[in-house]
């Protein structure tokens, strides 16, 4: 099992199963929605517009049983860390400071004052915990492991070796810890080992600054163009501020809209926190999702604007999946 920053899992089936075996778990980068259109999915469930901040839920799909004569014997899992707080203090402090100043000047509308209260509440909970796992995030991984254990009990027989690894980010390590503690509680006879090390980063969360600099050299102009297409803050500014002259002089409207949308998304990561759903129209939520989704496509996908090659940074991860599974199959162990 590997823990880092996305969620995907793989299950191998075979006609043999030994009592002793291996399970590999990971945590890394988020995946995108497929099937019906994104607009339709977000329309049915606006929380999905949060993108990488979506507090993922237990899947409801019915699983296809193994073919007759086959039974599960090995799991290779790669999962994102659980829900978290925003990574930097300024992500809370900048919009909060702007809103406090506007409130002192008496230019906030009733909705603007409501936004101020929500931002202040989110900032207070996150203080000193920037980038860390939330209680909801830990619970997500306990539930994930619980589902896996009960769906595939054959894989988790006594003595099975669970090799759990994470990146060195606190949120990834604590996600791994939550999952492993849950698993050990479900079967104390499992042999669970954990590792959080830079040594595993080359495949769990590989980075190549020179490669990225070469293929993302136009990042500033690309994002300015994306903002001009997807971010239209004029209506929202009128909803929040009484004085358009004040906004023109003191507010970067595009940045504020994106900052508030990010805070709206991250509000899902906590229990009982208010959100900013009253602030964005359905069209604005979809447009802002498109803006953020484009960023992922540009930086991590086959975008022609980044030479259609950024996905190749995940080669080491794919190789690890294949090599680990091949080793397990060849050894005739879980």
Predicted feature locations:
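Bacterial Sec-dependent N-terminal signal peptides
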Residues: 3-38
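Signature for phosphate-centric chemistry
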Residues: 36-161, 169-333
């Amino acid at each position: 099992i590997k823990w880092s920053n996305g969620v995907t899992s793989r299950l191998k089936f075979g006609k043999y199963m030994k009592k002793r075996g291996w399970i590999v778990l990971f945590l890394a980068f988020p995946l995108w929605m497929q099937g019906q259109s994104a607009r339709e999915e977000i329309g049915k469930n606006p929380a999905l517009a949060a993108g990488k901040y979506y507090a993922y839920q237990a899947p409801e799909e019915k699983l296809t049983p193994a073919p007759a004569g086959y039974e599960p014997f090995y799991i290779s899992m790669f999962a994102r860390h659980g829900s978290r707080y925003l990574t930097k203090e300024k992500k809370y402090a900048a919009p909060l400071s702007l809103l406090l100043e506007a409130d002192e000047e008496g230019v906030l509308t009733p909705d603007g004052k409501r936004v101020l209260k929500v931002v202040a509440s989110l900032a207070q909970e996150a203080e000193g915990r920037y980038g860390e796992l939330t209680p909801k995030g830990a619970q997500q991984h306990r539930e994930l492991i619980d589902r896996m254990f009960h769906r595939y009990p054959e894989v988790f027989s006594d003595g099975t070796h669970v090799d759990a690894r994470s990146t060195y980010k606190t949120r990834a390590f604590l996600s791994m810890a939550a999952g492993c503690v849950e698993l050990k509680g479900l079967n104390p006879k499992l042999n669970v080992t954990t590792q959080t090390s830079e040594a595993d980063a080359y495949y769990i969360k590989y980075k190549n600054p020179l490669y990225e600099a070469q293929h993302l050299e136009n990042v500033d102009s690309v994002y300015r163009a994306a903002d001009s297409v997807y971010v239209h803050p004029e209506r929202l500014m009128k909803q929040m501020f009484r004085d358009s002259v004040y906004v023109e002089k003191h507010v970067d409207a595009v940045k504020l809209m994106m900052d508030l949308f990010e805070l709206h998304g991250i509000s899902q990561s906590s229990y009982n926190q208010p959100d900013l759903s009253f602030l964005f129209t359905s069209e604005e939520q979809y447009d802002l999702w498109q803006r953020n989704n484009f960023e992922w496509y540009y930086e991590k996908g086959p975008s022609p604007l980044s030479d259609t090659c950024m996905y190749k940074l995940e080669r080491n991860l794919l190789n690890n999946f294949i090599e680990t599974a091949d080793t397990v199959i060849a050894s005739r162990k879980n």
